[in-house]
């Protein structure tokens, strides 16, 4: 009985694959939108490994790897649901954006709920060089050039990635200093709380800047 069921399932999967594999993803999505459940199953199966590959880039303290994958699958489903032909991008690019955003949103929500201090994200709009400067982490990443909408989307993904990697880049002292600084503390207040000289606080923030710039350079080379 089980063998017959498995054979039937296999035949259905084969039929679905043969039915859709010659079509563009955008055509399959049109079929999903008119209620074709086989078309939905086909896209979910097709992109499952893509989701797993994206999930490997992220981590969440206290969570299983499959939790991240499941969030990615939710993002994939949303991309299928929300994609429209008039979008000026391919479905795969749109799906990647939705998957990444879903994973990042889940991680940020979880870290806030667990009250984990700056283990994975920081504000990119806070001045970083010194208290008299209005230059921010955002400026370091984007530079002075005027960005078009497509570049803004790409850079937003970069920002999210940097936020999640920040905990790996910085030392314990640098994370503490940056967390307090982003919380609005002055150099003097940070030095008193951490029992460090003001110069040590300034040096820590300078190292944060250099590490971030180095990371961005290496990331650019690898792309």
UniProtKB/Swiss-Prot annotation:
Keywords: DNA-binding, Sigma factor, Sporulation, Transcription, Transcription regulation. Coiled coil: none annotated. Residues 187-206 bind DNA. GO terms for biological process: DNA-templated transcription initiation; sporulation resulting in formation of a cellular spore. GO terms for molecular function: DNA binding; sigma factor activity. Pfam families: Sigma70_r2, Sigma70_r4_2. A motif (Polymerase core binding) lies at residues 67-80. Transmembrane segments: none annotated. InterPro entries: RNA_pol_sigma-70_dom, RNA_pol_sigma-H, RNA_pol_sigma-H_factor, RNA_pol_sigma70, RNA_pol_sigma70_r2, RNA_pol_sigma70_r4_t2, RNA_pol_sigma_r2, RNA_pol_sigma_r3/r4-like. It comes from the Bacteria. Belongs to the sigma-70 factor family. Sigma factors are initiation factors that promote the attachment of RNA polymerase to specific initiation sites and are then released. This sigma factor is involved in the transition to post-exponential phase in the beginning of sporulation. NCBIfam families: PRK08295.1-2, PRK08295.1-4, PRK08295.1-5, sigma70-ECF, spore_sigH. This is RNA polymerase sigma-H factor. It comes from Bacillus licheniformis.
């Amino acid at each position: 009985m089980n063998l017959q069921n498995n054979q039937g399932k296999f035949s259905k999967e084969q039929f679905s694959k043969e039915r859709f594999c010659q079509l563009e993803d955008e055509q399959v999505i049109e079929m999903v939108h008119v209620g074709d459940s086989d078309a939905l199953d086909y896209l979910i199966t097709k992109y499952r490994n893509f989701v797993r590959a994206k999930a490997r880039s992220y981590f969440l303290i206290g969570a299983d790897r499959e939790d991240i994958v499941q969030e990615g699958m939710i993002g994939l489903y949303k991309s299928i649901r929300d994609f429209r032909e008039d979008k000026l991008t391919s479905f795969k690019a749109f799906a990647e954006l939705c998957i990444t955003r879903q994973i990042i949103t889940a991680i940020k929500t979880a870290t806030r709920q667990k009250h984990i201090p700056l283990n994975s994200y920081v504000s990119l709009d806070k001045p970083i060089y010194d208290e008299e400067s209005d230059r921010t982490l955002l400026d370091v990443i984007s530079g002075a050039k005027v960005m078009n909408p497509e570049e803004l989307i790409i850079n937003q993904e970069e920002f999210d990635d940097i936020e999640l990697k920040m905990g790996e880049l910085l030392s314990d002292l640098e994370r503490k200093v940056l967390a307090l600084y982003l919380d609005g503390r002055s150099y003097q207040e940070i030095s008193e709380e951490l029992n460090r000289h003001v110069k040590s606080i300034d040096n820590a923030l300078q190292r944060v800047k250099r590490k971030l710039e180095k990371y961005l350079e290496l990331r650019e080379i690898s792309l």
